[in-house]
Amino acid sequence: MIEVRYFARYREELDCDGERLPWSAELDSLEALRQRLLARGGAWQVLAEQCLMCARNQELCSLAEPLADGDEVAFFPPVTGG
């Protein structure tokens, strides 16, 4: 299983803070996972943003990062502050 978490605006727009998805060989990268989520259509298109940030096992990474069974993935918009 892969634990997927959504933060900030993504959590609000998706009305979902996270979910567990079965891992498979087709989910070999964060990009493959993102494409599976985008295929849901509708609000899930928010994950198509160029500025999307992601983390694997609580470390920032790129969408090219490989996935493995048991990983935790987080998607979040860029962080700004003041």
Question: Where are the model-predicted features located?
Answer:
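Ubiquitin-like/PB1-type beta-grasp interaction modules and other compact soluble beta-rich domains
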Residues: 1-81
